[in-house]
């Protein structure tokens, strides 16, 4: 057995339980398992039994969940799915059914219950929107859209902050059968046009300014340039957000109108009534975009039915979410977690929409909201938890948090030390759910599960209906060893197609070129055969393979970033003309610390001890900055391109594109 394999095996044997479910609590997962057992005549003793049945008999699983979820529809399906087709065939799901996504999100009739809590940086007031008020607003938006000629299949877009109006505009578009897409105000002009110019929207919603990190950021100049680059736009709706209407000049923006005038255009003598177009399950709902860090963003079309049923599965079964829950996911409208979060309305839960920095005026801003509103589920990026730990924040000592039962984390792998931090310094009884999937499926392959334990450093389990495995280079499943994350059977949440990809070649290249007929997601992971948990090891396009040893960059990060002297790090491969590979580790030093040979030696020793000698980088260098996407993900592939002397054309997806130039013409890299 190799040293690497032995280390992985030892790690598996050292599983540490951080949280266990209450055996007396009856969850929706338990009720669903019992319902399936009765309906199908099965003895399903635990989650593992249910999971394996759900992927083995995936057609029956989705049919049973359709019933359990209470999806609102006007016509029942004729067929769940054609099981003779594989995932690469992109089979049609629930053929013959008719439904509407927005109708399902607005189905709960407790009119006076709060649907949306709206909180903003720098404002004390929390605005409440009830379900009845939300329905009324969606009706107004939809009537105005219809008045201007928006119809099924038209694209409606938002260049918006995380706000009630973003939710209302999206639901209105969905009620008509228009396709919604959105980016957040932190995207630059090029980043927005790289996305929206591909889908030719008819209508755009935006704002005049936003507040972030204690500063007001004007938005009109960017919006004007975006509008100029979208010739098919018929209407630009400006929502006064920071300033009152009378202080905003939109005269330079063609076809522009203020929100109140736009909404008034759709009203007659009586308030408009909500109408929900009844559409096929596969009707397009969202166009989502890939990061665009190495080329033009891919435009992924997600269906209304597939998105709805997948999100309901994750919220109801895996999250045990009910109408008594209040969910805050810290996200922008440019990240798929916003779409995922909004779908929670279909459970009757309330949403908290927070717009602003999670660290201003203090790093406690989200914890303050938890106590003030009574939030039960808090979602964030793994990076935020690391930042809190670095700042030695201890909410367990400063906040009540008595309503909080779940913390969710995604965006990047959650470090093992973050598990310890959460249970020691935040709340010992909380379910810490690391979840992982992607924009490509607008959901999760794996994630939180209220019916099984949480183990340190592991995502709890593969999600129901998701036939996920880790494969080696030969296309064989590996257990307890590192491999490519694949999905072997059809899922309703895969994109129906890519926009502007008539022959499907881009789609096939994106997911099915590595293993024909099997979805390769682009992530590197390890599945623990003892617990069923998963450890994410980073993007497989950033996989390191020096001297034939394959490993993920996050394995290095987990060791390096435990050093107080290191604020951040980036681990990338470099190739010479002969195709040989060496690993280069860049360190961004923490404030007050300098890059020293002694630190380099201690890091090398720690990697050698924690992993193996073959994991030790060939070079460890200092850097002043590390590039991130606007969604907070490290950008390894683009740095690899710059190191190789290539140009990265599409910089609009980066939060700090200037840092890419730090990796060009580095003297220490020239002799390889």
UniProtKB/Swiss-Prot annotation:
Its EC number is 6.2.1.16. Keywords: ATP-binding, Cytoplasm, Fatty acid metabolism, Ligase, Lipid metabolism, Nucleotide-binding. The keyword ATP-binding applies. SUPFAM superfamilies: Acetyl-CoA synthetase-like (SSF56801). One of its GO terms (molecular function) is acetoacetate-CoA ligase activity. The keyword NADP does not apply. Belongs to the ATP-dependent AMP-binding enzyme family. PANTHER family: ACETOACETYL-COA SYNTHETASE (PTHR42921:SF1). This is Acetoacetyl-CoA synthetase. It comes from Mus musculus (Mouse).
